[in-house]
Amino acid sequence: MKKIFFLLACVTSVAIAQKKSDREDTIIRKHAVQSFHDLQEILRIPNDAHFPKDIEKNIQWCETAFAKRGFITKRLETPTVPLLLAERKAKKPVKTVLVYLQIDGQPVDSSKWFQESPWTPTLKEQATDGSWKVINYDRLYENINSDWRIFARSTSDS
């Protein structure tokens, strides 16, 4: 009997610990919505690794985006395209967080995409027959539906 109560207490405490407050949910949604414009913007920039000029445009976009967020960026030159190091120091550092971001993509065959262009982020929802139907991208700014998907080249990497 003691084991049952112990297990019940553990399960209940885990469930309570995982629940987000309404305030946290509001903050998360606010920042998610604010990020949709940036996501759409970077997905519109071709990033085929075989074209250094495309990668340069992506690096420039990242430099600007990081600078807006208080990061200092530094290019690390390589024999091909530069790497970008972005750093933001905390006032009272406790731990270091390292995030790896990949901005180059593989070549894409545009004829195999079921939309205008792989470089045009397109919001879709799944129909009852399993196909994906285009919906207005601006709907993301009004409401977030976790069943919607953004289709564009490199979306899963961004």
Roles of regions detected by a PLM:
Residues 1-20:
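Bacterial Sec-dependent N-terminal signal peptides
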Residues 18-157:
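Acidic/His- and Gly-rich active-site-bordering loop/insert found
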